[in-house]
Curated annotation (Swiss-Prot):
It comes from Klebsiella pneumoniae subsp. pneumoniae (strain ATCC 700721 / MGH 78578). Interacts with MhpE. This is Acetaldehyde dehydrogenase. The keyword Oxidoreductase applies. Catalyzes the conversion of acetaldehyde to acetyl-CoA, using NAD(+) and coenzyme A. Is the final enzyme in the meta-cleavage pathway for the degradation of aromatic compounds. GO terms for biological process: 3-phenylpropionate catabolic process.
Length: 316
């Protein structure tokens, strides 16, 4: 079976970790080119040491390379603004190319593998939301498939050391993109996202808190749905886990809570507490926020490539 060749744009933390994952674990994918803009970057130097072709001239440099003719997938780990330009350039040069967007740009549909990848296998561009979205949206969706979710709020706490310049430059986009995806993918009527950069030393692992307000439903059914969804995420992010038991609170009709922008609410409040430990392929174990993004992106592209192979076999 022919592996699909891959280029990664962005030689920072996320791009480098993703490269190492593909080199070690790629089933349908083969690492071909690492693209950066800083000739002195550690990511480009590491790629060269690992035998991967590189360019420090951005997406323009990639398109000038002989290897570009064989590239089927491009992962973009730059920034929201850069991705818009990168996608346009790639699409003009190669209309059928598959682009996996790890920025908050969201040109294509939001993709959270365990929730909606099957609906997006044939998209030309998919957006991996954010680290907080990849960790928490599965929990919102787990409740949503049992009961109607009116409101979901997530708080993602990540180690300050794991937040590179791209993450820091995209804080506003993080909250906006995650909030929208909580609604569109998670199924919540209204979503809200908060990110906290924790400066603690030694750095703490990624922690996520998810508050979900839904119609009254069986607490046992919701807890079972959450456990099942957590196991599905663990299939591609082994360090993903429930930190403690799911907590429930019934909010009675005669004592509703008032949510600004949503209104008065009564029903069931579900609280989910998560921890994400990184696989430490390139990044430290505390950087679970970056690991879950690269793991989700790899799982998405692998399944897309597998579907392409199956389709090619069916028409052969």
């Amino acid at each position: 079976m022919r592996k699909r060749k891959v280029a990664i744009i962005g030689s920072g933390n996320i791009g480098t970790d993703l490269m190492i994952k593909i080199l070690r674990h790629g089933q349908h994918l083969e690492m071909a080119v690492m693209v950066g803009i800083d000739p002195q970057s550690d990511g480009l130097a590491r790629a060269r040491r690992l035998g991967v072709a590189t360019t420090h001239e951005g997406v323009g440099g990639l398109m000038q390379m002989a290897e570009f003719a064989d590239i089927d997938f491009v992962f973009d780990a730059t920034s929201a603004g850069a991705h818009i330009k990168n996608d346009a350039a790639l699409r003009e040069a190669k209309p059928g190319i598959r682009v996996i967007d790890l920025t908050p740009a969201a040109i294509g549909p939001y993709c959270v593998p365990v929730v909606n990848l099957a609906d997006n296998l044939h998209q030309g561009n998919v957006n991996m939301v954010t680290c907080g979205g990849q960790a928490t949206i599965p929990m919102v969706a787990a409740v949503s498939r049992v009961a109607k979710v009116h409101y979901a709020e997530i708080v993602a706490s990540i180690a300050s050391q794991s937040a590179g310049p791209g993450t820091r430059a995209n804080i506003d986009e993080f909250t906006e993109t995650t909030s929208q995806a909580i609604e569109k993918v998670g199924g919540a009527g209204k979503g809200k996202a908060i990110i906290v950069l924790n400066p603690a030393e030694p750095p703490l692992m990624m922690r996520d808190t998810v508050y979900i307000l839904s119609e009254l439903a069986s607490q046992e059914a919701i807890a079972a749905s959450i456990a099942e969804m957590a196991a599905a995420v663990q299939a591609y992010v082994p360090g993903y886990r429930l930190k403690q038991q799911v907590q429930f609170e019934v909010i009675p009709e005669d004592r509703p809570v008032n949510l600004p922008g949503v209104g008065c609410f009564s029903g069931l409040k579900t609280a989910v507490y998560l921890e994400v430990e990184g696989a430490a392929h390139y990044l430290p174990a505390y950087a679970g926020n970056l690991d879950i993004m690269t793991s989700a992106a790899l799982a998405t592209a692998e399944q897309m490539a597998g579907a392409m192979h199956s389709a090619a076999g069916a028409t052969a």
